[in-house]
């Protein structure tokens, strides 16, 4: 699967899509492939504050439990409730159906510090 050029990426394999002063966050195709079949997703409540580089939730797969690290800081304004009933969406549609949280940015400049698609591809040895 190709890496979408319109997103930014963290070294912990989260993607970020900018929508005005908000961002949508999910995990990458590479990450879901490494984790295997996702069976449970734990996300923060709407209204929670998340801090860049700090855990904001977790995903449980048949192999392991892995923490989700916030690529940016801000206030959670929406969570993807579908993932409670359909955690497999993370495997099936990591960039579309399996977005995790929408966050109102506290510092928009944090997005620019994230990896471009090209840099993320280099980091993960993907073409």
Curated annotation (Swiss-Prot):
Record text on cofactor binding: Binds 1 lipoyl cofactor covalently.
A Pfam match: GCV_H
Gene Ontology, cellular component aspect: cytosol; glycine cleavage complex
Limits of the Lipoyl-binding domain: 22-104
Requisite cofactors: (R)-lipoate
InterPro entries: 2-oxoA_DH_lipoyl-BS (IPR003016), Biotin_lipoyl (IPR000089), GCV_H (IPR002930), GCV_H/Fam206 (IPR033753), GCV_H_sub (IPR017453), Single_hybrid_motif (IPR011053)
Gene3D superfamilies assigned: 2.40.50.100
GO biological process entries: glycine decarboxylation via glycine cleavage system
Modified sites of kind N6-lipoyllysine: 63
Top-level division of the source organism's lineage: Bacteria
Listed SUPFAM superfamilies: Single hybrid motif
Keywords for this protein: Lipoyl
Function: The glycine cleavage system catalyzes the degradation of glycine. The H protein shuttles the methylamine group of glycine from the P protein to the T protein.
Assembly behavior: The glycine cleavage system is composed of four proteins: P, T, L and H.
Family assignment from sequence similarity: Belongs to the GcvH family.
NCBIfam families in the cross-refs: gcvH (TIGR00527), PRK01202.1 (NF002270)
Protein name, entry field: Glycine cleavage system H protein
Organism of provenance: Bacillus cereus (strain ATCC 14579 / DSM 31 / CCUG 7414 / JCM 2152 / NBRC 15305 / NCIMB 9373 / NCTC 2599 / NRRL B-3711)
